[in-house]
Curated annotation (Swiss-Prot):
<comment type="pathway">
    <text>Amino-acid biosynthesis; L-tryptophan biosynthesis; L-tryptophan from chorismate: step 5/5.</text>
</comment>
<dbReference type="InterPro" id="IPR013785">
    <property type="entry name" value="Aldolase_TIM"/>
</dbReference>
<dbReference type="GO" id="GO:0005829">
    <property type="term" value="C:cytosol"/>
</dbReference>
<feature type="active site" description="Proton acceptor">
    <location>
        <position position="60"/>
    </location>
</feature>
<dbReference type="InterPro" id="IPR018204">
    <property type="entry name" value="Trp_synthase_alpha_AS"/>
</dbReference>
<dbReference type="InterPro" id="IPR011060">
    <property type="entry name" value="RibuloseP-bd_barrel"/>
</dbReference>
<keyword id="KW-0057">Aromatic amino acid biosynthesis</keyword>
<keyword id="KW-0028">Amino-acid biosynthesis</keyword>
<feature type="active site" description="Proton acceptor">
    <location>
        <position position="49"/>
    </location>
</feature>
<dbReference type="Pfam" id="PF00290">
    <property type="entry name" value="Trp_syntA"/>
</dbReference>
<protein>
    <recommendedName>
        <fullName>Tryptophan synthase alpha chain</fullName>
        <ecNumber>4.2.1.20</ecNumber>
    </recommendedName>
</protein>
<comment type="subunit">
    <text>Tetramer of two alpha and two beta chains.</text>
</comment>
<keyword id="KW-0822">Tryptophan biosynthesis</keyword>
<dbReference type="GO" id="GO:0004834">
    <property type="term" value="F:tryptophan synthase activity"/>
</dbReference>
<keyword id="KW-0456">Lyase</keyword>
<dbReference type="InterPro" id="IPR002028">
    <property type="entry name" value="Trp_synthase_suA"/>
</dbReference>
<comment type="similarity">
    <text>Belongs to the TrpA family.</text>
</comment>
Length: 268
């Protein structure tokens, strides 16, 4: 959990926002997936948001659903994902690592065991996409018991009560959703969300990172101008993977360019 705090402190000293890429672990194969993560970090990613392949990812649009299918086709299991996470953490001791999960995967071996495993491999945060704040008690208590930050989604239509709950229960960062619906770069992020950011700050919520539909540097700048601490981009990155499945080296070089440009936009 402290890694997020250290990151945000470091960035605010430099007057920079955070750029956080999302990819699905094991897409398109475990070996290439680790190379992709190396590339994202080398290009300037401030933290990682990683998905564990799941058969029915409700919050995700077609791009990330396809990433899940590719990882499944490569035979990737949750156990293998934890091995990959341990490898990433060993290589990068300081970068914050967040997981984006669905409740079934957390439940499968027991909630407490899941968070314990996360702690063992060096995961910093877990967002359970299909568990609303009101039903989150068993997840967030197990998370905190093992030193893992529970992350909550703040939707664009959040009312005051929900904002207070998110501020009270969330740690690490707050996932500010740019618009209703599923993930995807096809639909642009809806801005501005200044009023939400102002309220989250007033209630001392964890720093907001904005995601869903963030696919170009201009949007990163708009996100930071609205007061968010940074931007998360997933579908735009996964599309680069999808487009270059037969050219793994081109894939890595295009990813490097994209992340470098997105990161550059966080520097005022």
């Amino acid at each position: 959990m402290e890694r997020y705090q250290q990151l945000f402190n470091r960035l605010s000293e430099k007057k920079e926002g955070a750029f956080v890429p999302f990819v699905t672990l094991g897409d398109p194969s475990p070996e290439q997936s680790l190379k992709i993560i190396d590339t994202l970090i080398a290009a300037g990613a401030d933290a990682l948001e990683l998905g564990v392949p799941f058969s029915d990812p409700l919050a995700d649009g077609p791009t990330i659903q396809d990433a899940n299918l590719r990882a499944f086709a490569a035979g990737v299991t949750p156990g293998q994902c934890f091995e990959m996470l341990a490898t990433i953490r060993q290589k990068y001791p300081d970068i914050p690592i967040g997981l984006l999960m669905y409740a079934n995967l957390v439940f499968s071996n027991g909630i407490d065991e899941f968070y314990q495993r996360c702690a063992q491999v060096g995961v910093d945060s877990v967002l359970v996409a299909d568990v609303p704040v009101a039903e989150s008690a068993p997840f967030r208590t197990a998370a905190l018991r093992h030193g893992i930050a529970p992350i909550f989604i703040c939707p664009p239509n959040a009312d005051d009560e929900l904002l207070r709950e998110i501020a009270s229960y969330g740690r690490g960062y707050t996932y500010l959703v740019s618009r209703a619906g599923v993930t995807g770069a096809e639909k642009r992020a809806q801005l501005p969300l200044n009023h939400l950011v102002a309220k989250l700050n007033e209630y001392h919520a964890a720093p907001p990172l904005q995601g869903f539909g963030i696919s170009d540097p201009t949007q990163v700048r708009e996100t930071l101008a609205s007061g968010a601490a940074g931007a998360i981009s997933g579908s735009a990155i996964v599309r680069i993977i999808e487009k270059n499945l037969n050219q793994p080296d081109v894939m890595l070089s295009e990813l490097h360019t994209f992340v470098s440009e997105m990161k550059a936009a966080t520097r005022s």
